[in-house]
Regions:
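Alpha-helix C-capping/helix-to-loop hinge sites
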Residues: 4-8, 48, 74-75, 95-100
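Structural helix-adjacent loops and short alpha-helical linkers that scaffold large soluble proteins
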Residues: 9, 55-56, 101-108
Length: 127
């Protein structure tokens, strides 16, 4: 993803802003994807009943969505005031959170952000 976006406005030119973008990209891989995407995979593709899904995934996903909601409470994007790769990486699984058992209406700032990013990227709405 970084290679494909090199030289575009999706990667901030400013070193500090670029570091913030990387911080969110790393966080997505370690704290977000590992809960929301894994739960979605187990529920949607493996068709596991709730009782067979790793119990730690639900609170971990709720924690990730809560942190995102707090961060987005007073901003429209994760880094700066415009779309970056951080938003693209985070929207990928967040927009499918309902399939993982998370109701995004419980995180209104995240819900509004998903709608905004889907619109900007021309994606079919999932929420």
């Amino acid at each position: 993803m970084l290679h494909l976006a090199e030289g575009s406005s999706l990667i901030p030119a400013d070193a500090y802003e670029r570091a913030l973008m990387h911080q969110w990209l790393f966080w997505e891989q370690y704290s977000h994807e590992t809960a929301i995407a894994v739960r979605r995979f187990q529920k949607t593709y493996l068709k596991k009943p709730e009782s067979e899904i790793d119990l730690s995934l639900k609170p971990k996903g709720e924690g990730a969505l809560t942190l995102m909601n707090r961060h987005l409470a007073d901003r429209n994007y994760f880094v700066m005031d415009r779309l970056t790769l951080a938003d693209i990486a985070l929207v990928a699984y967040t927009r499918w959170a309902d399939e993982a058992g998370f109701d995004l209406n419980d995180w209104p700032s995240v819900c509004q952000w998903v709608v905004r990013i889907e619109s900007e990227l021309g994606l079919e709405p999932q929420t």
